[in-house]
């Protein structure tokens, strides 16, 4: 319960964050200049907190909220095309109770899965600046500390993959320059004396501070509409996750 309460406090800190002036201005712009199809929406217009199961073994790291997806609805991947792919795959693999989410107040619930992002504000052209990524990094580092049962981290896209590796190094993991590639799975361990955010668990082989990182192409329209990422390819990612963590919690 302590971790759950700490996560709630962290979520409040994220929502109230104003570290990046460019992103604050951009959120105000998209809130005040809604496209016709969303004129009736009351935009969230603030940084988005992470969400999911505090006891999750699967941690998903995305890039950033979509301007007219999460920044509109108030929940990551809710109401956009990437979310349609992600929630469908999570539902099929047993991590979500429903295959689609359009609003933050629907009954979607994640089980054994937690979703976060490299940055928590929608950036212009979906391209965060290096300093904006650094401003947001402490939130991810704190999630690493609080999510004590994580066994596998799924990085959606190359930026999320690169920044996840950087963050793991900062909490004591010995990680070489690993190449990004769809479906590539890496096992990394903390260096001797490094701080481990995972608990010791004989079933999960966490006594050595090991965690697995799985990379995938991001389910963005740029990738899905061009065929770079197909439904079977994305489904196989979650089949691999199930093989790695098993069914039991």
Residue ranges and their predicted role:
Residues 2-182, 195-200, 210-246:
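A polyanion-binding, active-site-adjacent surface
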Residues 185:
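Conserved flavin/dinucleotide-binding core of flavoenzymes
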